Amino acid sequence: MKRIFIGAALLVLLSSCSLTEPIPIKGEVVSCETIKVKSGKSEALECLGGGAPIAADAIVGPALVNVWGTWCAPCKKELPHFAHFLQKSDGSVQVIGIAVEEKSQAVVKKFIENNGMTWPVLYDKSGSTRATFGMGVPVTWFIDETGEVVHKKYGPFNST
């Protein structure tokens, strides 16, 4: 089952990598109430769109979790690919962002609205996700329905 999930998720995501134009939609700060969770041990992160705080290690999939920053050029280039993936997956795979190393929630919310993001975003004020995801961005994890990380992608997805 895990291999089918990984294969399907990667196929949809990588097929969307040929998309070079941004998706022309206005972003929206979305509630995290739809994120599937189990109990977690890491620090709970605030959701920019409301809902209970969620620990990064509590997320249950199928989910694609992308750790990013507004200041990160490769992260911004990935956004059309994730928007396209979300559109193609038709809700069968959650897309969740985790914003790190940010000045304020207001900066992140404005970025979301100006860059076509329409998925839930958690806000890592303290940098606690480094313990879970490691240093550097962008980082993308594929999480299965049991909450196990089944694939890690360090660095940006691109169209090559």
Segments (PLM) and residue ranges:
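N-terminal targeting signals for export/organelle localization
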Residues: M1-E46, P156, T160
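Conserved hydrophobic/aromatic "anchor" residues
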Residues: K2, L14, E43, V67-W68, ...
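A short beta-strand-turn-helix
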Residues: V37-A63
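Short active-site neighborhood of thiol/selenol oxidoreductases, capturing the structured segment around
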Residues: I54-K76, F82
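A generic structural signal for alpha->beta connector loops
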Residues: G61, S92-V93, T118-W119
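Hydrophobic beta-strand anchors of alpha/beta hydrolase catalytic cores
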Residues: L64-V65, V95, T140
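Thiol/disulfide oxidoreductase modules built on the thioredoxin-like
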Residues: K110-T118, Y123-T160
